[in-house]
């Protein structure tokens, strides 16, 4: 049965979802209620991007940003080719990540190389970039609901102009737990570390995860 995501997000029109979802992600209690509802609606299956068809039908910016989304079979093939040809240490990079479909496929294939009781979120770290305002909330949600670790750059991969950057971390290091989120400060230090130039005045001071020293250490791993 097709999931009615507008009903789950409690909106009348799909254009309202990105802004509302972004606000929910910064409220731990509210987002975890949403996460559980999404998990139940998708039979607890986190192997793929649930929003692939919904986002492509309702939110894709095909004219302005030439957005199209990678089919699951292609994402699976790409992931397996990389893992088989080069080995895989769990570090993942993707520009133009969209809502995270290829990233999720890689994460899923990677975690399945471990026994369920042996895998820990610290074994996989994703560094992903995306330009679209509409995609970013879904990309963040997809990482957080799966208990992933990583950094999300909201900006232009080519010019390195960056509107915001987000640190996603599973502080319990437990793949049955959700991840938290911090907005990375717009400072010269982080511009240098992330190779970006912050250009947006819309910085939201949200540092729920940990002390900055811990963030620095993770960035320098």
What positions do the PLM features span?
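Class I S-adenosyl-L-methionine-dependent methyltransferase catalytic core
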Residues: 1-221
């Amino acid at each position: 049965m097709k999931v009615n995501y507008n009903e789950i997000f409690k909106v009348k029109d799909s254009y309202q979802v990105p802004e509302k979802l972004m606000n929910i992600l910064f409220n731990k209690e509210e987002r975890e209620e949403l996460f559980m509802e999404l998990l139940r609606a998708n039979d607890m299956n986190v192997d793929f991007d649930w929003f692939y068809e919904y986002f492509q039908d309702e939110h894709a910016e095909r004219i302005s940003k030439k957005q199209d989304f990678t089919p699951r079979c292609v994402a699976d093939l790409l992931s397996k080719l990389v893992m088989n040809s080069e080995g895989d240490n769990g570090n993942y990079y993707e520009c133009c990540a969209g809502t995270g479909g290829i990233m999720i496929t890689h994460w899923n294939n990677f975690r399945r190389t471990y026994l369920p009781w042996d895998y820990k979120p610290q074994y996989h770290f994703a560094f992903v970039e995306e330009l679209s305002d509409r995609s970013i909330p879904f990309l963040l949600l997809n990482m957080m609901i799966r208990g992933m670790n990583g950094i999300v750059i909201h900006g232009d991969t080519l010019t390195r102009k960056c509107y915001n950057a987000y640190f996603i971390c599973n502080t319990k290091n437990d793949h049955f737990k959700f991840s938290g989120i911090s907005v990375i400060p717009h400072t010269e230090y982080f511009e240098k570390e992330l190779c970006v130039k912050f250009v947006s005045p819309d910085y939201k001071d949200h540092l729920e995860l940990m002390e900055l020293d811990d963030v620095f250490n993770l960035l320098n791993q």
